[in-house]
């Protein structure tokens, strides 16, 4: 964490990202033959570190000036980066997309529909407006679709609803690292 902070100060124009284990607690499964006891695997995941891991991965696909602070053990078992990249949803102003297609894309990349509470890795549909809280961001995006055409893409604070910035395009990355091809 200290190195991450130092690199952010040293390289303010670069995407300095943090990719470490997201477990606050991890107990592997085990067997104690003396007492014939099986201990189940138990763990606790840190949601903020999971967000930072997904942010690091999305930055690697978006930018050329990325510095990732990580431990070596974290790079194993992430799955195929080509498959992950194929799942990215590119939203662009004036592009044609139906409500049902966007809903299907979001579900395919592990976002869950929740029309009540907007939280990380969820989306909701309010008429022709999609509100999506990317897994790797601290801001949500609002996509306004009219007549199957993207009219606007705006980032906003998911708690207050305050709009922050308009986008001409937005790349929406999967909500998990572990994804598979539909086939």
Which role fits each region the language model picked out?
Residues 1-183:
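ASCE RecA-like P-loop NTPase motor cores
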């Amino acid at each position: 964490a200290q190195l991450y902070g130092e690199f952010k100060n040293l390289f303010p124009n670069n995407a300095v990202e943090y990719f470490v284990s997201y477990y606050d607690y991890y107990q592997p499964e085990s067997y104690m033959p003396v007492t014939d006891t099986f201990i189940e695997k138990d763990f606790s995941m840190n949601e903020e570190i999971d967000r930072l891991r997904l942010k690091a991965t999305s930055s690697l696909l978006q930018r050329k000036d990325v510095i990732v602070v990580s431990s070596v053990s974290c790079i194993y078992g992430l799955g195929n980066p080509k498959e992950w990249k194929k799942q990215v949803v590119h939203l662009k102003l004036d592009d044609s997309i139906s409500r049902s297609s966007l809903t299907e894309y979001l579900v395919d990349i592990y976002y869950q529909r929740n029309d009540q509470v907007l939280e990380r890795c969820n989306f909701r549909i309010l008429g022709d407006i999609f509100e999506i809280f990317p897994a790797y961001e601290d801001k949500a995006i609002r996509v306004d679709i009219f007549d199957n055409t993207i009219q606007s893409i705006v980032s906003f604070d998911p708690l207050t609803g305050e709009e922050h910035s308009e986008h001409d395009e937005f790349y929406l990355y999967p909500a998990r690292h572990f994804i598979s091809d539909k086939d």
